């Protein structure tokens, strides 16, 4: 069985990790053993935060819808309930955009929701 020299593969593996650690502070950017741990931890944060981003944006949309609904004299929950009863299926992302950039359209939706609740 021939002897396997691992210099090329080891160097490639080290380089791959050190390229990923580019921009890190201190020895995390140029010492392989430390950079490897930092890159692993960064990957864990990325994985976690990709999921958290979805939750945070939903919270932001709800806060914006709530603020706009309260300006029109409604709570968020009653506004959403009115929309559901009026069979208006608009997601929270679009509602938040309407609340920020197109107040008359949002007010029209709120009026429909109010009418549905009053009936």
Curated annotation (Swiss-Prot):
Gene3D superfamilies: 6.10.160.10, Ribosomal protein L20. It holds the Pfam family Ribosomal_L20. Keywords: Ribonucleoprotein, Ribosomal protein, RNA-binding, rRNA-binding. One of its GO terms (biological process) is translation. PROSITE patterns: RIBOSOMAL_L20. GO terms for cellular component: ribonucleoprotein complex; ribosome. InterPro entries: Ribosomal_bL20, RIBOSOMAL_L20_CS, Ribosomal_protein_bL20_C. GO terms for molecular function: rRNA binding; structural constituent of ribosome. NCBIfam families: rplT_bact. Binds directly to 23S ribosomal RNA and is necessary for the in vitro assembly process of the 50S ribosomal subunit. It is not involved in the protein synthesizing functions of that subunit. Belongs to the bacterial ribosomal protein bL20 family. This is Large ribosomal subunit protein bL20. It comes from Dechloromonas aromatica (strain RCB). The lineage of its organism: Bacteria, Pseudomonadati, Pseudomonadota, Betaproteobacteria, Rhodocyclales. The gene is rplT.
């Amino acid at each position: 069985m021939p002897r396997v020299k691992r210099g090329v593969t080891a160097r490639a593996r080290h380089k791959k990790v050190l390229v990923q650690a580019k921009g890190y502070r201190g020895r995390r950017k140029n010492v392989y053993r430390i950079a490897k741990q930092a890159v692993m931890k960064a990957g864990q944060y990325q994985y976690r935060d990709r999921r958290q981003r979805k939750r945070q944006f939903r919270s932001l949309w709800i806060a914006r819808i709530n603020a706009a609904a309260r300006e029109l004299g409604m709570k968020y929950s009653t506004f959403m309930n009115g929309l559901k009863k009026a069979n208006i299926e608009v997601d929270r992302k679009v509602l938040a955009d309407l609340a920020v950039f197109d107040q008359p359209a949002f007010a029209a939706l709120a009026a429909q929701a109010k009418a549905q609740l009053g009936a």
